[in-house]
Amino acid sequence: MDSKVVIYTDGACSGNPGPGGWGALLKFNDASKKIFGYELVTTNNRMEMTAALEALRVLKKSSIVEIYTDSKYLQHGITVWIHNWMKNNWCKNNNEPVKNVDLWQKLYSELSKHTIMWRWVKGHASNSGNIAADKLAVQGRETAMEILKCRG
């Protein structure tokens, strides 16, 4: 039987684009795992997507996954828009290319490995999982900012 995992994800960016971070809190039964990372120049949407992607990559076996995100871009993109984008060769209905195709394709490849429910949660509210993911994302962003500061 597949194991159940609950994941909270978030992204943070100073400027858009700018230094950014992503974070995720994974909960399995009685255990939890926190992960975070950064990019020196990125966007808020890329960090939101990276948080979900990296969290899914942590999972070593097929799982039933609930992903909570405060990004409607991520939730709608992966559950609604992606199917048309793929049919349209990664173009939107107005023939403009879809942004972040590299990450959408990587996320899509993770879908076949798990049963995933994508849930939207209001950001910066009272959801403890989202608050924890936000703190991790901010930690990643601050790391990126420190690196840039050291480089002058």
From Swiss-Prot:
Compartments (UniProt record): Cytoplasm
- Summary of subunit composition and partner proteins: Monomer.
> What functional role does this protein have?
Endonuclease that specifically degrades the RNA of RNA-DNA hybrids.
Show the taxonomic lineage.
Bacteria, Pseudomonadati, Pseudomonadota, Alphaproteobacteria, Rickettsiales
Location (main, coarse)? cytoplasm
Which residues does the record give as Mg(2+) 1 binding sites?
10, 48, 70
Q: List the catalytic activities from the record.
A: Endonucleolytic cleavage to 5'-phosphomonoester
Q: Which organism is it from?
A: Rickettsia typhi (strain ATCC VR-144 / Wilmington)
Stated name of the protein: Ribonuclease H
Cofactor (UniProt)? Mg(2+)
Keywords, in A-Z order? Cytoplasm, Endonuclease, Hydrolase, Magnesium, Metal-binding, Nuclease
- Pfam families, per the entry: RNase_H
Gene name of the encoded protein: rnhA
